[in-house]
Amino acid sequence: MKREFISLVAVRLACLLGMFLSAWPSGQAEVAQPDSADGLFALDNFLEVKIQMSPLYWDRLRYQYRDITQERKPGEAFKDNYTYLPALVSINGESIGPVGLRKKGLIGSSSTQRPSLKIKFNFAKKGGRYLGLDRLTLNNNIQDPSLVKQYLSYKLFRKAGLPAPRCNFARVFVNGQYLGVYTNVESVRKPFLKRVF
């Protein structure tokens, strides 16, 4: 009975997705415009991201959390208790200089051992960018043992003509410790919006 219910729900969701995608007006598709960050998100570019920061700052970052029980007005966002801390980053051996690093996520992806991360390139230098981007998002995929759901979802959206962030994969190290494979996701900010709209 439970299995039939799950199957029925899955079929209905697939039908709804199909109806949504088929109703999307043509001409709204994302136009592929090459930019300097294209290579950063190429699927065949398995990034190696090495982060160096004070162990004190790393522990502070890892143990920050958002209180999901806090009182909020309807529609009000959670108070952002995550703060950017100074770090040095290299991507595929290229030093990016001082950046800001913070934890990201709410419940599942806010692990203390392997947190999802945001890298802010304009933390130490106003207007600082890397390949035209002001930040990167590294998702830990803790809730996805396959590690590919986010990548495949965004690829499906783009194939359907919907704007979606570019992404690929990265091996992430902090202070020499290997944290694992993360999804490197284009942050939805001004550079993304200018690229797709």
Listing of model-derived features with the role each one plays in the protein:
Residues R12-A23:
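Bacterial N-terminal signal peptides
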Residues S7-L8, L17, A29, D67:
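Intrinsically disordered, low-complexity segments enriched in polar/charged small residues
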Residues K2-A14:
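Bacterial N-terminal signal peptides that target proteins for export
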Residues W24-F197:
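Phosphate/dinucleotide-binding and metal-coordinating scaffold of catalytic cores
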